[in-house]
Amino acid sequence: MHGPTSKAISRNVRSVKRPRRAPRPVVSTQAMNKLSNVTLSAEQEKLRERVLSFMRSNLSQYKSDWKHPAMFVIQGDAGTGKSVILNSLFNEIQKLSQFSPSSEDILHGTHNYLVVNHPEMLKLYIRISDSFKYISKSSLERPTSLINNLQKRKVMADVVIVDEAHLLATSKDAFKRFYGENHLKDLMSLCKVLVLVYDDKQALRMGSYWDEGSNNGATLKDFYNEIPPKSRDWYTLKQQFRVAAPQNVLNWIDQISVAGKIPPIESVLSKGNADCADDKIKNFDFKIWDDCGAMYEAIKEKDRQYGQCRMLSTYDFPYRLDGKDYYVECGDNFKVRWDRYTPREVTPWSERCDTIDEVGSVYTIQGFDLNYAGVILGRSIGYDAANDCIKLRPELYDDRAGFTKKKNIHNAEDVKQKIIMNSINVLLTRGVRGLYVYAYDPELRERLLRPSKK
């Protein structure tokens, strides 16, 4: 039997009056709740008000012949609540820009943007905007898009807030349609007030390399010092909100991922925090494993119990964006595929049920929390027996794009080492309830588990 002709179908479609589609409900995720439904601490609330006061003061004094915007930097290690403050701050200034108790408020009628150079984080902010009536999706941008947009329209923003400013490009990237020399430099020419959240220990690529301790890439303080003292401010957050671990575990993470030293195993397995009043800290689950397959089984069990427990690895196993599956292999009993590239996926990788069958990279998990993180220290991370410390082997690190040399990288080998250390730091600071660690290198694995000599 033949169906109706295409013309008949066309007429039928036009003749039917379709009902208006109902708004899509906002499905809340843990990542959304942790960023938007959080009561600020006393320090965070005080900082938010300090930034608001800074904005008002500098907007009211702004003159068109100024060469630089006012700049407020919020620095802090991973997990210190930087993005939580930004989300609250941006919601407040957007509310004041549209509906202010006083039309004389300098923020009334302002045009403001929140920028993040991280696709997963941008998707999260866009989803959160559905729950905040004052935040429009058009005010949330990747830096290149905003720069190109403002330059094309020849307009200036009032306030630009940058989350994860350590991911801003520090060199030209024609592939991503950025033709300037530095994202921050261009943003500084396109706004009156700039607020940056920053942690140079999370810079992961030579093309967006920020380092306050060398002449490689870019240094935020160089830009900051160009601004007159009255138009700049810098605040450092120190309280850890994500990793609810005792201080000895936090020290272990810092020693491994920043100093490259190997603390005694007893220092993290001791019960020195038994008297801690905070049960979350007292019960933080830390373990170094000698069997990656067994660690994975434990992570799956924790995922059934708590959810959001995942395997992670340094970028030490091959991966290409060619549509094929690539695998992380450790020993005889662990072969799990890398996370698949899914740009259309709305739910964060850490919260999708299917990703328990994957290993996440530093790019997948940066900016997000897990309840338990099972971290594989891959092939590029070995052991220097002579000096009893971490030994890095950059030639085994497989992030080719991350190691693409730029003209402002003067000591490429030093930068490669720092990028690997930064990636370790990002991975080790994801777990809220627990951290499991496995070292691919057998000598390092044995050393991490070895008791100190008495």
From Swiss-Prot:
Domain of life: Eukaryota
Family matches, as Pfam families: SLFN-g3_helicase (PF09848)
Biased composition (Basic residues): 14-23
Region (Disordered): 1-25
Keywords recorded for this protein, A-Z: Cytoplasm, Nucleus
Entry keyword annotation includes Repressor: no
Record bears the keyword Cytoplasm: yes
Disulfide topology: none
GO cellular component: cytoplasm; nucleus
Location within or outside the cell: Cytoplasm; Nucleus
Other remarks in the entry: Present with 1130 molecules/cell in log phase SD medium.
Protein name: Uncharacterized protein YPL245W
Provenance organism: Saccharomyces cerevisiae (strain ATCC 204508 / S288c)
